């Protein structure tokens, strides 16, 4: 394969990842199949970088003219519109299942139900409120830090979420599941590129902030995996969405705490 063909292949995989995780239209020439989607997992972090960057741009463009809370809300709205609330939906379904089911089978069945339950509604509401409040505090501390936090958190949280695919068992047997192709044949190349995208955005941060966030994310990933194993024996697409949302919120927490210390 020539260098040009290799670059074309990687761009193709990135566009597949973008089409999977966002509402941004893919070019007509991009063909999607299970093998491509599987390999595209290497670029899930970069998709987060794109979403975070666009959200940060909206925040930076409006923060001089609008109250911090409104600018943050607009930035969050951009993120939701770009992704279609994909991860938020997974968070709600996961909390409905984990909160309402007694056995792993019950939890998986509840998570499959498209209706929103009380546990999911509470989790979704609290998650959005937490993100808004934390970002407002970061914006009041330093608008540059708040915008950078959006970029870092959207990227790193997706790296944490997607990395679960490489070590854990996919527990749904439904062949029509949108996440089923991701559970097959993940390679070391996908993992290394995924991790590299997370390390890349840490350059936005100072040394202590970057190190603190890295250590917390490693610990959080381990904690999430332990919970998923105990609850359902592995992961589903919904739980990956929940992991992303939780990791994003924790990112904001860490950056706010470290920012106040510095």
Swiss-Prot record:
Stretches that traverse the bilayer: 43-63, 66-86, 120-140, 146-166, 191-211, 242-262
GO molecular function, one term: cobalamin 5'-phosphate synthase activity
Keyword Lipid metabolism (UniProt): no
Keyword Transcription: no
EC code(s) of this entry: 2.7.8.26
Alphabetized UniProt keyword annotations: Cell inner membrane, Cell membrane, Cobalamin biosynthesis, Magnesium, Membrane, Transferase, Transmembrane, Transmembrane helix
Catalytic activity from the UniProt record: alpha-ribazole + adenosylcob(III)inamide-GDP = adenosylcob(III)alamin + GMP + H(+); alpha-ribazole 5'-phosphate + adenosylcob(III)inamide-GDP = adenosylcob(III)alamin 5'-phosphate + GMP + H(+)
Top-level enzyme category: transferase
Topology in the lipid bilayer: Multi-pass membrane protein
Biological process per Gene Ontology, one example term: cobalamin biosynthetic process
Entry-linked Pfam families: CobS
UniProt main location, coarse: membrane
Signal peptide interval: none
General function of this protein: Joins adenosylcobinamide-GDP and alpha-ribazole to generate adenosylcobalamin (Ado-cobalamin). Also synthesizes adenosylcobalamin 5'-phosphate from adenosylcobinamide-GDP and alpha-ribazole 5'-phosphate.
Family: Belongs to the CobS family.
Protein name: Adenosylcobinamide-GDP ribazoletransferase
């Amino acid at each position: 394969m020539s260098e040009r063909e290799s670059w074309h292949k990687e761009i193709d995989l990135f566009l597949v990842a973008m089409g999977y995780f966002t509402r941004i239209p893919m070019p007509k020439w991009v063909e999607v199949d299970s093998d491509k989607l599987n390999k595209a997992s290497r670029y899930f972090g970069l998709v987060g970088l794109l979403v975070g960057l666009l959200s940060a741009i909206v925040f930076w463009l409006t923060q001089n003219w609008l109250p911090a809370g409104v600018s943050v809300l607009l930035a969050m709205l951009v993120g939701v519109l770009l992704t279609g609330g994909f991860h938020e939906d997974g968070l709600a379904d996961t909390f409905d299942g984990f909160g309402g089911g007694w056995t792993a089978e019950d939890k998986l069945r509840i998570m499959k139900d498209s209706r929103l339950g009380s546990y999911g509604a509470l989790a979704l509401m609290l998650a959005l409120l937490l993100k808004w409040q934390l970002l407002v505090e970061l914006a009041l501390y330093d608008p540059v830090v708040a915008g950078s936090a959006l970029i870092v958190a959207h990227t790193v949280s997706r790296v944490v979420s997607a990395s679960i695919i490489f070590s854990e068992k996919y527990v749904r047997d439904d062949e029509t599941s949108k996440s089923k192709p991701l559970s097959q044949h993940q390679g070391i190349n996908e993992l290394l590129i995924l991790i590299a995208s997370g390390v890349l955005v840490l350059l936005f941060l100072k040394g202590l902030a970057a190190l603190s966030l890295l250590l917390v994310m490693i610990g959080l990933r381990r904690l999430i995996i332990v919970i998923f194993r105990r609850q359902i024996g592995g992961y589903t697409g919904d739980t990956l969405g929940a992991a992303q949302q939780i990791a994003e919120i924790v990112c904001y927490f860490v950056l706010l705490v470290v920012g106040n210390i510095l």
